[in-house]
């Protein structure tokens, strides 16, 4: 590798391994905990392997893949996070995004047949305008709507949930300072 080819490259200090020894008053550690990490070309962590106490049955591996939104230069939003051990997967989350890179849905797999779905909607300014939580025991989904100021599209004005509860906010736009908050409490 020549220095010319490295001149315009991007670098970051990547933690590739971490080891912690627990000495408990002894000269040698009675317990050691090690973790290894790996990264993609954008510096996103794609692998975390936790060796626990050194027992092969305790090893947990988290693998993460990311959305690649080249036009927006967004590479850090996870697409899937998978936690596995010796017996298979323990946790799984998938993430959907819109063309702007906003997260529109997360799916948390509680088992192969059970999925908890959160959905999100955004306005053209990238502000969150609706969040809907997973179904409860009765199939109901708690939702929240968010209203933003009409002038700057920066300041949250109101949050309302599907039960009819709401909170209202007022700001001093000169300083971005919250001046009033009112809710049912």
What do these predicted ranges mean?
Residues 1-185:
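Non-catalytic interaction/targeting regions
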């Amino acid at each position: 590798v020549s220095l010319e080819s490295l001149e315009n490259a991007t670098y970051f200090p990547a933690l590739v391994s971490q080891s912690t020894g627990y000495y408990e008053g002894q000269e040698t550690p009675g317990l050691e905990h090690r973790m290894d990490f790996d990264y993609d070309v954008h510096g996103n962590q794609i692998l975390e392997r936790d060796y626990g106490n050194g027992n092969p049955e305790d090893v947990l591996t988290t693998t993460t893949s990311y959305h690649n939104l080249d036009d927006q230069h967004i590479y850090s939003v996870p697409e899937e996070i998978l936690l596995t051990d010796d017996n298979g997967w323990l946790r799984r989350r998938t993430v959907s995004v819109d063309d702007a890179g906003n997260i529109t849905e997360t799916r948390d797999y509680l088992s192969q047949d059970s999925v908890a779905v959160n959905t999100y909607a955004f306005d053209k300014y990238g502000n969150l305008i609706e969040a809907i939580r997973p179904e409860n025991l009765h199939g109901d989904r708690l939702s929240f709507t968010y209203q933003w100021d009409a002038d700057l599209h920066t300041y949250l004005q109101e949050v309302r949930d599907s039960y009819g509860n709401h909170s209202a906010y007022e700001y001093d736009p000169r300083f971005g300072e919250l001046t009033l908050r009112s809710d049912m409490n």
